[in-house]
């Protein structure tokens, strides 16, 4: 039985999140040899070259407006998002960043309403958002950490979520060009790579070439560059085209879930009751927020209760 285009979009989003949720393991290994900005630059260089090798077709320049959208997407989704998130990690706890960045679906829904004139998010969306954020909080704090606010770092993490929302909206606008999304993703990477160059001088870029070819580092760089960047961004951008930015962004809720499960499987970290409860709550939040999944409303429950109470004995 063949998948419908919509079902394929959901499957693609899920597979992308499964890969993105495990990238922290590779990043953790690479941080022993490289700085965050070095990992970022090498990762997207490999990503761009991978797309160029597999899809060498040239994407012609058509309109200045198109190039501005590509540049905006590269600046937001490639350069600023990762840089702001990394800077936030130096000013606040990683657990805080994990929760704040998960607000991206909320910002995406609001921007889609204001910018794309889509339907205003309703009570069901906010209920799902609340459940997912509560679940993510249980996962990242894991019953061991008390919330400790750090205004600068927390604001930067929220800014990173907003930046990703901007990227999602720009990606949807780019999808409207009706061009090959892989080629569009490559053009986005190109601009993101260009915008990243000034940051290299700001944060320092002095990678040791020999360390890049150590087998463990090479494996993780290729995983991040080819798998988590070239493949996942191309698939994610196609998913935004199929499902729309809001519905696609909801899958971001699952990143902490995949992270905690992969930690248990790969790093043998203990899966606590708080993490299990958080996983269930996060999944519930995703299902509640999913508009196309019909859940029984108040009238349905009233009707069922009425039938039960009026049933003859």
Where are these regions (language model features)?
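Glycine-/small-residue-enriched transmembrane alpha-helix faces in small-molecule transporters
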Residues: 1-38, 75, 147-173, 195, ...
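C-terminal-most transmembrane helix of multi-pass membrane proteins
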Residues: 2-3, 11, 42-44, 253-313
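Hydrophobic alpha-helical transmembrane segments of multi-pass integral membrane proteins
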Residues: 8-12, 38-53, 72, 125-134, ...
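Specific transmembrane alpha-helical segments of multi-pass solute transporters/efflux pumps
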Residues: 19, 23-24, 52-101, 111, ...
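Membrane-interface helix termini and inter-helical loops of multi-pass transporters
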Residues: 25-33, 89-90, 140-152, 202-216, ...
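Helix-loop interface residues and adjacent transmembrane-helix termini in multi-pass membrane transporters
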Residues: 33, 91, 118, 177-178, ...
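Specific alpha-helical transmembrane segments that line the substrate/conduction pathway
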Residues: 38-49, 77, 86-124, 160, ...
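Hydrophobic transmembrane alpha-helices of multi-pass small-molecule transport proteins
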Residues: 51, 71, 111, 121-143, ...
